[in-house]
C-alpha cells in the first residue's frame, strides 16, 4: 500500500503540528544527527550483507542468540518477507481492523483469507485502535494456526505486558516483529527486526535480499541500541497526557475518542467525514490528522490521532471544536 498511510506530510506545505503519525514528534535527535555526520564516509563502501553486527547487539539486549534475530528495512520489509517465505501455505487470517500491509502483502503473494488460515497476523498493540491483547490470549492464537506473526511495533508506547523475544524463541510457530522506527522515532531510517526460533529465522534468511540495510542506517541502529534511549523518556506521563487529550475530545459535541492503551487512538465524528475534517485542519490550522477510513472495517467517520505536546494537544482540540461549532 504505497498510498493511504498516515504521516502524509509531503502532501502539504504548511503543517505545523503532526498528529497523523503514531510516532512522538518531540524526540531530540541532535546527538544522533551529530554522530551520523562523523560516519558519512561509510557510504563509500558496501555495508554488511546481513547487518550481523547490529543483530548481535540486539540479541545481547534481548537475552537471546544472534541466530534468533533478523534485522530488516523496517517492520514493513519484514511483513513482506514473511508473506513471501510462507507463500505456499496459501491461507491467512488477519485480525481486523488493523495495519493494511498484512492484507496487502498476503494479496501480493496469493493468500486466501480464512478464519482458520495457516498464518495469523496480529498487531499488538493494535494500529489503529490502541488495543492490547493479553500475552496469554496471544499465545492461545498460536495454538489455532500454523504460524502466528505478532507485530509489536508499538511495544514502547504502552505499559501493558507483552510477549518478550525470550518467550517465543523456543516456539516453532511464533514470530515477533519489532520497529526501531517507532522505538527511537527515526522513520526515515527504515529499521526493524524479527525475533523467532533459529529455524524460522534461517528460513527467512533464504529469501532475504543482500545489503537490505544501508550503511548509514546500520551505523545509526548500532549507535541507538548501544545508548538504549527510546523516543519517550517518561512514558507514564505521556500516556497520562493521552488520556487528558481523549477526555477533552470527548467533551466536543459530535466527537467520540475511543479507549486506548497506547499513545494513539481512534475518534469518530458524526457531523461530517474524517476526510473533510482532515482537509480543514490542514489548510486552516496547519494540523495533520490521520483519515482512518481506509482501514478494513472502519467508516468514513473514523480518524486517528497520536498524542503530542500538551500545547499542541490543546490546539488540536480548539481547532476541532471550531470546526464543529461553525
Regions found by a protein language model. Give the residues of each.
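Conserved PLP-anchoring active-site segment centered on the Schiff-base-forming lysine
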Residues: 73, 85-107, 112
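PLP-dependent aminotransferase class I/II
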Residues: 28-31, 50, 173-251, 256-258
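Conserved PLP-binding catalytic core of the aspartate aminotransferase-like
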Residues: 239, 252-285
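PLP-dependent enzyme catalytic core of the Aspartate aminotransferase-like
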Residues: 283-284, 297-326
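N-terminal "arm"/small-domain region of PLP-dependent enzymes with the aminotransferase-like
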Residues: 1-45
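Active-site phosphate-binding strand-loop segment of PLP-dependent enzymes
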Residues: 107, 114-161
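Short, conserved charged micro-motifs
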Residues: 30, 272-279, 311-315
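Conserved beta-loop-alpha segment that forms the PLP phosphate-binding cup at the N-terminus of a helix
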Residues: 51-55, 65-89
Amino acid at each position: 500500500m504505497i498510498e493511504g498511510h498516515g504521516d502524509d506530510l509531503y502532501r502539504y506545505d504548511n503543517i505545523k503540528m503532526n498528529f497523523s503519525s503514531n510516532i512522538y514528534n518531540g524526540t531530540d535527535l541532535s546527538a544522533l544527527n551529530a554522530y551520523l555526520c562523523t560516519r558519512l564516509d561509510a557510504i563509500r563502501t558496501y555495508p554488511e550483507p546481513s547487518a550481523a553486527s547490529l543483530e548481535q547487539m540486539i540479541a545481547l539486549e534481548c537475552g537471546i542468540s544472534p541466530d534468533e534475530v533478523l534485522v530488516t528495512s523496517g517492520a514493513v520489509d519484514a511483513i513482506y518477507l514473511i508473506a513471501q517465505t510462507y507463500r505456499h501455505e496459501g491461507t491467512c487470517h488477519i485480525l481486523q481492523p488493523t495495519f493494511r500491509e498484512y492484507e496487502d502483502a498476503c494479496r501480493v503473494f496469493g493468500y486466501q483469507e480464512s478464519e482458520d488460515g495457516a498464518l495469523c497476523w496480529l498487531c499488538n498493540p493494535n494500529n489503529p485502535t490502541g488495543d492490547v491483547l493479553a500475552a496469554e490470549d496471544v499465545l492461545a492464537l498460536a495454538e489455532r494456526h500454523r504460524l502466528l506473526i505478532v507485530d509489536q511495533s508499538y511495544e514502547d508506547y504502552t505499559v501493558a505486558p507483552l510477549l518478550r523475544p525470550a518467550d517465543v524463541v523456543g516456539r516453532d510457530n511464533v514470530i515477533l516483529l519489532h520497529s526501531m522506527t517507532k522505538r527511537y522515532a527515526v522513520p526515515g531510517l527504515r529499521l526493524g527486526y524479527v525475533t523467532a526460533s533459529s529455524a524460522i529465522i534461517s528460513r527467512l534468511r533464504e529469501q532475504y535480499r543482500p545489503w537490505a540495510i544501508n550503511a548509514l542506517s546500520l551505523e545509526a541502529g548500532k549507535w541507538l541500541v548501544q545508548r538504549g534511549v527510546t523516543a519517550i523518556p517518561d512514558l507514564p506521563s505521556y500516556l497520562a497526557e493521552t488520556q487528558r487529550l481523549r477526555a477533552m475530545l470527548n467533551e466536543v459535541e459530535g466527537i467520540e475518542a475511543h479507549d486506548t492503551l497506547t499513545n494513539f487512538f481512534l475518534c469518530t465524528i458524526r457531523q461530517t467525514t474524517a476526510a473533510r475534517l482532515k482537509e480543514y485542519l490542514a489548510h486552516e490550522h496547519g494540523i495533520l490528522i490521520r483519515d482512518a477510513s481506509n482501514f478494513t472495517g472502519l467508516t468514513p467517520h473514523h480518524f486517528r490521532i497520536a498524542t503530542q505536546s500538551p500545547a499542541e494537544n490543546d490546539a488540536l482540540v480548539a481547532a476541532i471544536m471550531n470546526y464543529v461549532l461553525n
